[in-house]
Amino acid sequence: LLIDQHEASYTYGTGNTHRITGDFNFITGENAAFRLNAMVQESDNFGAKQDKRGIAPSFSWGIGTRDEFSIGAYYLTTEGRPIYNHPWRLSSDGKINTTLPARNFYGLESDYNNTESKYITLGHIHRFDDNGELNTRLRWGNYKRDMLASTIGFQNSGITLGQINESTVLTRGSKGRIGESDVLQAQSDYSNTFNWGGKKHAVLAGVDYYDDDAKRNQSYANTTPRPTTIVGAPNNGASVVDGRAPVQWNTFTSRNLGLYAQDTVSLTNTLKLVGGLRYDDFSASYRNPAGTISNKISDSLVSPRVGLIFQPDELSSYYVSYGTSYNTSGDTYQYGISLSNSTNRAAATPPEKSRNIEIGSKFELFERRALLGVAMFYSEKYNERNTDPDTAAAQELLSGKRHATGMEFNLAGRLTPQWEVFFNHTWIPDAKIDRSNVALAANGGGAQVQGDRPGLTPKHSGSVWSTYAITSKIRAGAGITYRSKQNPEGSRAVYASGFGVVDAMVEYAIDDKTSVKLNVNNLFDKVYADGLYRGFYIPGAARSVQLTLKTRF
């Protein structure tokens, strides 16, 4: 932080995208500095516009001294017009077929997806004489989202894939959501290393607090009739007035106080034992607009964690770990309020819980220029909630218990001074819903049932990205993001095929401070179903090209 250094960039790209960013750092005293991050983006994006404005100033003083302080602010506003969905057509075996060009926006000019995020953060670090450190952070924030989007469907619900053409009529339904949260977060943790009982200990202990006062309406559709359109006329400029009644709010407040401690004990020069414990005091209360349905949750939750690390040399380590955790987000449990008093299961259902066992290893390779990680895991989730606002009211719990077994592979770093690689892959050969009260639909479709593989759980997923310095001034790179086939959540009899999306870039250093970079995302313009839902998909981003000029001064 104690350096006068600045960076600015300008990007122009597909969809008439303009983006300017700046990162400015000023020394203001012997141990004080001011930093300012700012950005502006405007993008028509063929109708699905994405405009953003953001600024984040921060000031730090006492840097590196006994008492270090900081204060920062963050503000980001977005004005968008979303592609909410594209309708799918199914093959006889249940395969999801994409139907429309990925970049085509068939919504209305009056659609929008606007967000606002703002928060203030205060920080203090106290350094003790014995090398201990107390790090405290306090943040207050306000977050808003207001979305009114068009749901796209075929007027002829029985149309087949081969019958779709430029004149095919599309309907525009309405989907509206609005929400606001006031959030207070505080965390203070103490860390130190010391010798006790003839062993070296690295201790971390602390407390955190999270307070969320929120209001939501997840079903706030426009009542005004909406015109149809045709496949061959995307972004046709049609608009309707907002005919909705004043918003009716579901409200909730959630509080969580967490206490945690962890000790890493060096048993020998090569063997370390890690033990930790976390306690959460979680409570939340929910109420519908009329106040006729309310629900309260209150739990005291204990999460143990233990691990063993073996480091035979400086270049490798092996570990085994076991841990549990709970979901203490108030948002997760809000959909119980949508049920009637007679069917409300939320109050009687314990909170979401996860349990994870992992065995892995890490290796430093290529003269410590790269890090390789391999891990095997077994994870369980209990009382999994449905957080999809469109379906949670009818199916609040996805499963009583499910598990997944798999492996993760990671490689990051330079294989040679010129060649850089980033690779991650997750393989989940075994995943199953172990307990569920969901009944199998008469037609064999519907939501996943006990014994099924959970939705949105592909066997293979990952990405690889590699760059190579061709000369001292020219660097080129390419990579692929991929995913194998999977089912949507709530649609066990249909599936989306696997896909791979290729990105590429080339960068030229004009001098040691200025460079220009060309990025091509989705190089081969692959059309694929990225987000999967019950009855529709969100298309993956179409091919885009961006040219960025960046300079440091």
PLM regions: where:
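Repeated loop/turn-to-beta-strand initiation elements of outer-membrane beta-barrel proteins
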Residues: 31-34, 66-71, 131-134, 198, ...
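C-terminal beta-signal and adjacent terminal beta-strands/loops
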Residues: 416, 473, 481-489, 507-553
